Amino acid sequence: MTDLTSLTLAEARDGLARKSFTALELTEAHLTAIEAARGLNAFVLETPEQARKMAQAADAQIATGDGGPLAGIPLGIKDLFATKDTRTTACSKILGDFHPPYESTVTTQLWRDGAVMVGKLNNDEFAMGSSNETSCFGPVVNPWRRAGSETKLVPGGSSGGSAAAVAAGLCLGATATDTGGSIRQPAAFTGTVGIKPTYGRCSRWGIVAFASSLDQAGPIARTVRDSAILLRSMAGHDPKDTTSVDRPVPNYETAIGASVKGMKIGIPKEYRLEGMPPEIERLWTQGAEWLKASGAELVEVSLPHTKYALPAYYIVAPAEASSNLARYDGVRYGARVNGRNIVEMYENTRAAGFGAEVKRRIMIGTYVLSAGYYDAYYLRAQKVRTLIKRDFEQCFDQGVSAILTPATPSAAFGIGEKGGADPVEMYLNDIFTVTVNMAGLPGIAVPAGADGQGLPLGLQLIGRPFDEETLFSLGEVIEQAAGRFTPKKWWA
């Protein structure tokens, strides 16, 4: 029998429909894989009993022909999504042993469609990080290694657990969130596919907030088709989220294999950074050639405010975070460290509960929102954001269907290698991805090649608002040309 953990989500779905195996068998195979891969630290909570019950329920539905589109599919859930009566911590000590009395909208929709939860996935604390090193549960180890080396690499962040679990065959797909690149960068680092949908496409209700005007949920999966299948279940209007957009959810899977002939693909000159590694440059050129060979037309475009995106992002995101994280005070839920009075209790709780990176961003955010600095920093950053959005609008007004860029400035790096003394070094990982969040656009990262040491590299496609289908069609062209990327198993 085929190793069930090596199947794509689409293959597993078809196999379940044909009754080649049961949902319980599929789930057991993944639970065994999770157990053997604990050294990767991708999961912060395994839920085997719950998974078996959900798989048995899926088998019963499949038997009567009532199975949903994800019936019996084992998924991992980023620990930012509230899961009812199942510990949810955002990988922060401050949430302690929090068991939400409610379920996030996105996970509710996944369970409605028959998916099986195998566990909660590691992430950077409160989704603040680009390497999954800020989690209170410790770093996630990338299933990929450099050729001939045993150095442990980061999987990217903040959705590092999601990307590592999918790459290592521990689940068939995973939920993730993206505030400045937290789906696309880990996908690129692990040879997986990650899509950040248009802002408002997926509900944010029940997801621990980082920066509310930037946060967006999306899937990480092994293939473009798999990510399309997952997004269809995750997306949809939710009256509980005022930023959720009320428009029909298309069947994204129909975009797979659709012709890209005649599509105009923008190549932004501002993304050609000084000191860009030659292998990233080559990959970008190669990706453009693949799209051209499929009938797309390449055009150079200009996004003149790109260079201001990263500094503006690191004002807007911390400002919103400082406001969102004010609610963690030890009073109503989560951890509490007592003091002689209530103010001291707040101080003690927040000092003990938040990690260094979260504290840094709260302080930056509080500073840029403070009297005397608000206009100089926050207001100016919001103006830059408007200009970035306008750059994209002008580009799309010229008939451009999508924009092709690198996903990351490098391949995965070693745990502890970056950002020690200078956090800006770590922040630069988001250089190609933050513009998409600032403009509220959809972006997909697709594995497209490998660096000189055999590590996967990804390309990013940026689309028009609510035109995820075009990204899936173009992404599949790159995927077909580049082939699949699977790490050699060393961890079990």
UniProtKB/Swiss-Prot annotation:
It catalyses: L-glutamyl-tRNA(Gln) + L-glutamine + ATP + H2O = L-glutaminyl-tRNA(Gln) + L-glutamate + ADP + phosphate + H(+). Signal peptide: none annotated. GO terms for biological process: translation. Keywords: ATP-binding, Ligase, Nucleotide-binding, Protein biosynthesis. It is an enzyme of class 6 (ligase). One of its GO terms (cellular component) is glutamyl-tRNA(Gln) amidotransferase complex. Allows the formation of correctly charged Gln-tRNA(Gln) through the transamidation of misacylated Glu-tRNA(Gln) in organisms which lack glutaminyl-tRNA synthetase. The reaction takes place in the presence of glutamine and ATP through an activated gamma-phospho-Glu-tRNA(Gln). This is Glutamyl-tRNA(Gln) amidotransferase subunit A. It comes from Rhodopseudomonas palustris (strain BisB5).
